[in-house]
Amino acid sequence: MSEFEVSNEYKLQTLNSRLEQLNVEGWHNEEAKTVNIALGNEDEVQRLTANIQIIKQAIVSVQEQITALNE
C-alpha cells in the first residue's frame, strides 16, 4: 500500500496509458523483429524476442493492477 493518496480514477488513467504504451512498444519490437528476420540478423532477432516477452509480462502485470482497482 502506498503512503501517497492518489485517486483510483487517476491510477486507472495512468495504468491505461501505460498499457497503451506497452502495446505500442511491443508492436514496434514485432515490426523490428520481422525486418531483422528478413535480414538474417539472428542476434537482433533474439534480443527483440526477449524484449517482446518482457513487454508481454509487463502487460499482464498492468492488466492485473487495472483489474484490482476495478474491484
Residue ranges with predicted function:
Residues 22-29, 51-71:
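Amphipathic alpha-helical coiled-coil segments
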Residues 1-24, 50:
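Short, charge/polar-rich alpha-helical segments
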Residues 20-50:
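Short E/K-rich amphipathic alpha-helical oligomerization segments
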